[in-house]
Structure formats: structure tokens, C-alpha cells
């Protein structure tokens, strides 16, 4: 073993500088943070050759007292803290006292500063960590610091610097982050003598966003905020139309400090998930104000990462705030179309009495298969039941013939079905306040030989009174124009044209129903006539074992036999007739790509998304009744505006929009 050497001060300072000062933009970041901590309201940054030749920062802050000028350049000399306990209560941008010492050890540094109570200031010049002079000077209140010839005395670092263009871009980026985090401060970036960036310190975050980005982005923002006991989350998220294919337009600020956080990014992106298309990333500027003792900023040399005491609670707070803001914005856009006051929903709160019991007794109810009445297996259309008929918890249905033609959205064919109680919360999606209308009738007295008999369980259940629908005025001012390419439904309402993607809309309806069934534990399954056997690899089998409860709660009945072989006996009813093996493997690979710490809710949503995609029919020629049915199903959803993959389910054109297209108006 070689002899252990004690490094000299110059060497240790250069090594320390390598941790704090990576490139010229690191110098700008550290010095601007010092200016902000000094209370500056106007900060000018001048650079030459991407900051490699010169970085000059001018501020109008409080300045440095003459007695402290020399001490400011000593390692770990700071005015921000006194002891280790202060680190966990820090509210300033800097606190370690490393920046000036590190910068001056690898450059030629000149600093001038004056405080308001002195008539003159002090000037100090340091070259390679050595003080060349310290003298009195005349200057304005505040601080001016010049850093030239960065890394001139560290050739190993100098040769790894990027191009001047690249470093200029990095400096512009960090200045833009400061503009966003401190809209009350005016920033001015001058590159090679020309103004590159200018903000005006109005204190309005939207003005800062417009300065950093452009008018289009600033006009397509959604404000959000959420305030808890120890944390406030607020800022702006971009509407789906300004999403990008990269995360460059995302900014996170914790106590005004720009940080990078994968879990905060994940919280925002998961909130956006059903509103954006695949591989699109949302625009957002998010601020998190939290008591300093609940975070640790001392986990990275550049303070670009933070740790939170309770990441799960933080995730939920951010997710809820962003998700509600997006839903509210989309809901506002389609207020005229989704005016639920026009729909006369029956009062289910008054119709439910005792809890449902689980005793069984078989009763046969005949249903005429040749009549125009159909069974809605998703639970929105049952009407004019025979007197004293009870809707009960589990109804086993064995189909004898097909119930409807191939264009029927809502009929399952040739499956053994387990049918849920009409008053389950899940039956009408996730909207607890709205229950579906009663439309179609089940007829009792038809003697036709094509009769389907239902085995009705839970005879001792409490009766549920069904009110017959009164006429409503939702369709009075709505005109169904028709379909285009058997894919898009054209509707006129209140002098506005709505175009609905029928497949995306149907997928959303199924998704919300399935997701709610999972959440409430009421998933309806169908038994496969022939169980599906799948041989898995060891890795695939381990993923299944890790998530087998997720599959079970989602309506899959899976047995294992052999070493890595599974047998799928039941799948969710909502799937219709899927390719079971392909669907199962798609879900498995989707779960594999998720992190193990992802919440079960996210995993269930992923399963529901894949499952409902497999259930949607394509290119159906819909009857007017089916179009109305689809619209009614959308009405009871909390978020009918986008499909589970983020594509819009509908778009709207006002009369003014169309007249602009045809140049009738300007």
C-alpha cells in the first residue's frame, strides 16, 4: 500500500471546485443565488465565449461589509448558518460557503461591493486562490463580481469544456429558471455585448412564462393550487395542445429553488396521463412551498436534488391538485354540451333502503329475445320492470341466442355472465351523484318459445324502487347530423358543432366503469369456455407472482401449475371476447416496465387502459338510439373529454370558428 499523503490547501480547493463548479453555468448559478440571497431586485449577467472567458454579475443587493470581503473567499465561510441544525431550517439559496472559494481557486476573480451605510466600497482581486490585492473603491450599493479565464490553472478540466455555444445555451437555461422562480426580480442576460434575455420583475408569473417561452404558451395555461398544513403546491400547467415530445418545458421549484425530481415529475405526468397521447410530456411550472425541516437540500453538491420526509403524501397532493385543474378546464370547455341539468336522473338516494343480503333463491323471469328490448350488461338501460320486481346482487345469465345484432355496443355474446346489482356505486361510473336513466323495458308475459330465463339470486334483498323516467329536454336543442366514416359522430347543439370520436368515447366509458369496479371491489368476471394456458419465462412468472393480487382484483382468475405455467379461467366481463393470451402478456409487460413502488391505483389504471382498448369495436354504423346511449353514458363520467390514452373524445367548433375558416370574418 502506498503512503497516505495529506493534500495541500490549493489542491483540496481545486478538487472541491470540481464538485461545485462543473461548467460556466454553475458559476452563474452560484453567483446569482448569492445575489438573490442579498435581496437584489435587479441582476445583470454578462458573458463572453459562453462564460469561459468572462462572467460578470451585477446586482443591487445589500452588499458585503468591508470587514467581511476577505472572509467571503475562505472555504466554508457563510453568513447563512451557524451550526449543523441550521441546515435543516435553511430558507436561503446558498448555505455551505463553498461557492466563492471554489470559483476563485480555478479562475481570476475580481469583486467590488458596498453596503448602504458606507460611503465607499471594497475591491478584491484573487488569482488561482491567492489574493493579489484588497483596496477601497467607489461603487454603487450592491455587488459586482467578474470571473475570467475559468479553469485556466486546471488544464484537465479546461479541455473537457463544451463549445461556447453549448455553454451559452446552458447559461440561458439557468437564467430562465431564475426568471420563473423569482418573477419579482428583473434579470438581464448580455451575451457578447448584446442583450439575450430580459425580464421586468413585475411579480406576475404569467409575465415571466411569456418572457421565457412565448405568447402561445402563456395563453394556454391552467392555474392550479392546493394548500395543506405544511405544504402549498401551486403554479401553471399547460393545456394538452402545448405538450411536447421531451421534458424540456418542465420546471420544479421547491422553496423557490430549481430542482430535478423524478417523483414530482411522475406525479404531474400521471395526473396528465389520461389527457395526453403516448410519448407526449406536459408543460408545467410547479412551486412547492414547504417548511424547511420537512426537506433535505444537502444531498447533492449543486443542491439540484432534494429529499422529502413523506414522498407518498407529497405525490398525492401534487397529483390531486394537477388532476382536478385539468378536469375543471376541460369541463368548462364543454359546459354547453355536458349540461347535466338537462338530464332527468332518478333519485337513487331515496330508492335504496336496507343493505343487500346474500341468501339465494331461484326465480325465473322470462325475457323475449325477439323483442326490441335488449339487456344492457353495463348497467344503464333497464326500464318498466314488472311490478314488485327486485334488482338483486348477482344474476346468472346463460345466453341461448344472440340478443342483438353485431352493431350493438353493449351486448356480450355466448358467455356465462355474472351480472351486478343496478345500484352498485360502480354501475354508473365514478360519478356518485349521478345514476343512469331507466330506458329499455323487460317484458314478462310474452309466450314466445325463444325465452331466456334468468336465475335470480338474493331474493331476500331489500326492494329498490325504480322511478319511471320523465321526459327531459337534453335532446330538444340537439341535432344528430350523422356519422362520418363510421367513426365520427357529428352533432349540432346550441349553435356549436361537436365531433365525437365514437370509439374513443366508448373506450372511455368502458374504462371508467371497469376502473370503478376495480376500486369498489365489484369486478364482474366471465368464465371462459376453454381456459387459456400460458407458459411463462422465469422473469415473466416472477412479475406475475409479484402482481397476482392486482390481476385477481381486476377480474382475472388465474391458477398456476407446473413450474412457470399459468391457467387463465376467468377474465373481466367488460372485455367481451379478447385475445386472452395477448392481453395478459401486454398487461404483464406493462407492469414489468413500472417501478415496484408504483401504487396499486396506477397499476389498476394501466390494466383498465389495456383491457378496454381490447374491448372497443371499430367502424360501427350506429343507430340514432345507440348514439344517444353513448352520449348519456358520457354524461355521467367525471372526465368524458379524453380517452384513457389521452386522445380527445370530442372537439368543438363554434359558429365563429367556422366563419373564420371560411374567411367570412377576420
UniProtKB/Swiss-Prot annotation:
Task: Kindly list the GO molecular function terms attached to this UniProt entry.
Answer: ATP binding; ATP hydrolysis activity; ATP-dependent DNA damage sensor activity; mismatched DNA binding
Extract the Gene3D superfamilies matched here. 3.30.230.10, Histidine kinase-like ATPase, C-terminal domain (3.30.565.10), MutL, C-terminal domain, dimerisation subdomain (3.30.1540.20), MutL, C-terminal domain, regulatory subdomain (3.30.1370.100)
Would you tell me the Gene Ontology cellular component terms? Answer: mismatch repair complex
| Keyword field contains DNA repair | yes
**Entry keyword annotation includes Lipid metabolism:** no
Q: Which UniProt keywords apply?
A: DNA damage, DNA repair
- What Gene Ontology terms for biological process does this UniProt record contain? mismatch repair
Database matches in InterPro entries: DNA_mismatch_repair_CS, DNA_mismatch_repair_MutL, DNA_mismatch_S5_2-like, HATPase_C_sf, MutL/Mlh/PMS, MutL/Mlh/Pms-like, MutL_C, MutL_C_dimsub
Q: Which SMART domains match?
A: DNA_mis_repair, MutL_C
Source domain of life: Bacteria
Which Pfam families does this UniProt record tie to the protein?
DNA_mis_repair, HATPase_c_3, MutL_C
What is the role of the protein in this entry? Answer: This protein is involved in the repair of mismatches in DNA. It is required for dam-dependent methyl-directed DNA mismatch repair. May act as a 'molecular matchmaker', a protein that promotes the formation of a stable complex between two or more DNA-binding proteins in an ATP-dependent manner without itself being part of a final effector complex.
Q: Which family does it belong to?
A: Belongs to the DNA mismatch repair MutL/HexB family.
Q: Mind telling me which NCBIfam families this protein's record contains?
A: mutl
Q: Give the protein's recorded name.
A: DNA mismatch repair protein MutL
Source species: Clostridium botulinum (strain ATCC 19397 / Type A)
Amino acid at each position: 500500500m502506498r503512503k497516505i499523503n495529506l493534500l495541500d490547501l490549493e489542491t483540496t480547493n481545486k478538487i472541491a471546485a470540481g464538485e461545485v463548479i462543473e461548467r460556466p453555468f454553475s458559476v452563474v448559478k452560484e453567483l446569482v443565488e448569492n445575489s438573490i440571497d442579498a435581496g437584489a431586485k435587479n441582476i445583470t449577467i454578462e458573458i463572453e465565449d459562453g462564460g469561459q472567458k468572462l462572467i460578470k454579475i451585477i446586482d443591487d443587493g445589500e452588499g458585503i461589509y468591508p470587514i467581511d470581503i476577505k472572509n467571503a473567499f475562505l472555504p466554508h465561510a457563510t453568513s447563512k448558518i451557524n451550526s449543523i441544525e441550521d441546515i435543516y431550517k435553511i430558507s436561503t439559496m446558498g448555505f455551505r460557503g463553498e461557492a466563492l472559494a471554489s470559483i476563485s481557486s480555478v479562475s481570476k476573480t475580481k469583486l467590488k461591493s458596498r453596503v448602504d451605510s458606507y460611503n465607499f466600497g471594497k475591491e478584491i482581486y484573487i488569482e488561482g486562490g491567492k489574493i493579489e490585492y484588497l483596496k477601497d473603491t467607489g461603487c454603487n450599493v450592491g455587488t459586482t463580481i467578474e470571473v475570467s479565464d475559468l479553469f485556466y490553472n486546471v488544464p484537465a478540466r479546461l479541455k473537457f469544456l463544451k463549445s461556447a455555444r453549448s455553454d451559452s445555451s446552458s447559461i440561458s437555461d439557468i437564467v430562465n429558471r431564475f426568471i420563473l422562480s423569482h418573477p419579482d426580480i428583473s434579470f438581464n442576460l448580455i451575451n457578447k455585448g448584446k442583450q439575450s434575455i430580459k425580464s421586468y420583475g413585475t411579480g406576475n408569473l404569467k409575465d415571466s412564462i411569456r418572457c421565457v417561452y412565448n405568447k402561445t404558451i402563456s395563453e394556454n395555461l391552467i392555474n392550479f393550487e392546493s394548500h395543506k398544513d405544511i405544504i402549498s403546491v401551486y403554479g401553471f400547467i399547460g393545456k394538452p395542445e402545448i405538450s411536447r415530445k421531451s421534458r424540456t418545458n418542465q420546471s420544479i421549484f421547491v422553496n423557490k429553488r430549481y430542482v430535478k425530481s423524478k417523483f414530482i415529475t411522475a406525479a404531474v405526468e400521471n395526473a396528465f396521463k389520461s389527457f395526453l397521447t403516448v410519448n407526449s410530456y406536459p408543460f408545467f411550472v410547479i412551486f412547492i412551498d414547504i417548511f424547511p425541516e420537512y426537506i433535505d437540500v444537502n444531498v447533492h453538491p449543486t443542491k439540484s436534488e432534494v429529499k422529502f420526509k413523506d414522498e407518498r403524501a407529497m405525490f398525492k397532493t401534487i397529483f390531486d391538485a394537477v388532476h382536478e385543474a385539468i378536469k375543471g378546464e376541460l369541463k368548462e370547455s364543454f359546459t354547453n354540451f355536458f349540461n347535466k341539468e338537462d338530464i332527468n336522473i332518478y333519485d337513487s338516494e331515496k330508492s335504496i333502503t336496507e343493505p343487500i343480503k346474500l341468501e339465494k333463491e331461484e326465480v325465473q323471469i322470462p325475457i323475449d329475445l325477439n323483442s326490441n328490448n335488449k339487456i344492457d350488461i353495463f348497467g344503464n338501460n333497464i326500464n318498466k320492470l314488472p311490478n314488485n320486481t327486485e334488482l338483486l346482487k348477482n344474476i346468472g345469465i346463460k345466453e341461448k341466442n344472440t340478443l342483438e345484432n353485431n352493431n350493438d355496443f353493449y351486448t356480450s355474446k355466448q358467455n356465462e355472465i355474472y351480472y351486478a346489482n343496478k345500484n352498485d356505486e360502480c354501475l354508473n361510473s365514478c360519478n356518485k351523484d349521478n345514476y343512469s336513466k331507466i330506458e329499455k323495458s323487460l317484458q314478462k308475459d310474452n309466450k314466445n318459445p325463444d325465452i331466456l330465463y334468468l336465475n335470480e339470486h338474493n331474493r331476500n334483498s331489500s326492494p329498490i324502487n325504480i322511478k319511471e323516467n320523465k321526459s327531459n329536454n337534453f335532446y330538444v336543442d340537439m341535432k344528430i347530423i350523422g356519422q362520418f366514416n363510421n367513426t365520427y359522430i357529428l352533432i349540432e347543439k346550441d349553435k356549436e358543432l361537436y365531433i365525437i370520436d365514437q370509439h374513443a368515447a366508448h373506450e372511455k366509458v368502458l374504462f371508467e366503469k371497469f376502473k370503478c369496479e376495480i376500486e369498489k371491489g365489484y369486478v364482474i368476471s366471465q368464465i371462459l369456455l376453454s381456459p387459456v394456458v400460458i407458459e411463462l419465462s422465469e422473469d415473466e412468472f416472477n412479475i406475475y407472482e409479484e402482481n397476482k393480487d392486482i390481476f385477481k382484483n381486476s377480474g382475472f382468475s388465474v391458477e398456476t401449475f407446473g413450474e412457470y405455467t399459468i391457467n387463465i379461467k376467468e377474465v373481466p366481463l367488460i372485455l367481451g371476447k379478447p385475445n386472452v393470451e395477448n392481453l395478459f402478456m401486454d398487461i404483464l409487460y406493462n407492469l414489468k416496465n413500472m417501478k415496484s413502488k408504483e401504487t396499486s391505483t396506477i397499476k389498476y389504471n394501466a390494466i383498465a387502459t389495456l383491457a378496454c382498448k381490447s374491448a372497443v369495436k371499430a367502424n360501427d354504423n350506429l343507430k340514432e338510439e345507440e348514439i344517444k346511449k353513448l352520449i348519456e353514458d358520457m354524461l355521467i363520467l367525471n372526465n368524458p373529454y379524453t380517452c384513457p390514452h389521452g386522445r380527445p373524445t370530442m372537439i368543438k367548433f363554434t359558429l365563429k370558428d367556422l366563419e373564420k375558416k371560411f374567411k367570412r370574418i377576420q
